[in-house]
């Protein structure tokens, strides 16, 4: 019997703030490729997950879920603060990102465990911005439905980002724009 595929009891999972000792496991979770609009994307945080997050966050909160039986880091997310302009003033707003669940642990209510942690640690401002790929149905179901115990989700609209994959000729690029 494969222990990874059996239901997990809450008491085998620890949700805690990530430490430098978790750096390699965090980079492995983040690097798993995902597909959106037919393009495979892989996020890299080399050589250090924590150093790379300096670009996104001024104040960091990186969280891992560890399976105490296997001592494996099975999920993670970040919910730190970053500066944003609001009504012509710079204010710190929370930005939630890097939500990842190890493929072999999906469907084991890990997002519910994370939801409890988010609610417990969400301080002023008690909301977070986040970006979810439109076709990332697993993340959308986990975050948007309320079934997982995550805080209420409010859709602020669709962000469309264009990507230039080849410089081509100037005429083609100008025509595209």
Regions picked out by a protein language model, each given a short descriptive name:
Residues 49-64, 126, 153:
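A short helix-loop-beta-strand connector motif used in the catalytic cores of GNAT acetyltransferases and
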Residues 118, 128-144:
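Conserved beta-strand-loop-alpha-helix junction that forms the acyl-donor binding cleft
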Residues 56-60, 67-88, 97:
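Acetyl-CoA-dependent GNAT
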Residues 101, 106-121:
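Conserved acetyl-CoA-binding loop-helix of GNAT-fold acetyltransferases
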Residues 84, 131, 148-170:
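Conserved catalytic-core motifs of GNAT/GCN5-like acyltransferases
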């Amino acid at each position: 019997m494969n222990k990874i595929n059996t239901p997990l009891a809450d008491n085998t999972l620890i949700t805690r703030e990530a430490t430098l000792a978790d750096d390699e496991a965090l980079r492995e979770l983040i690097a798993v490729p995902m597909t959106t609009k037919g393009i495979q994307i892989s996020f890299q945080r080399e050589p250090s997950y924590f150093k790379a997050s300096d670009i996104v966050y001024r104040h960091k909160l990186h969280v891992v879920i560890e399976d105490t039986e296997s001592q494996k880091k099975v999920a993670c997310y970040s919910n730190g603060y970053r500066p944003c302009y609001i009504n012509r003033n710079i204010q710190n707003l929370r930005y939630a990102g890097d939500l990842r669940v190890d493929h072999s642990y999906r469907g084991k209510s890990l997002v519910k465990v994370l939801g409890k942690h988010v609610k417990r640690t969400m301080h002023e401002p008690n909301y977070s911005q986040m970006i979810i790929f439109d076709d990332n149905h697993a993340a959308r179901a986990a975050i948007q439905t309320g079934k997982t115990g995550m805080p209420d989700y409010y859709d602020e609209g669709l962000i469309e980002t264009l990507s230039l994959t080849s410089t081509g000729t100037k005429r083609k690029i100008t025509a595209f724009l």
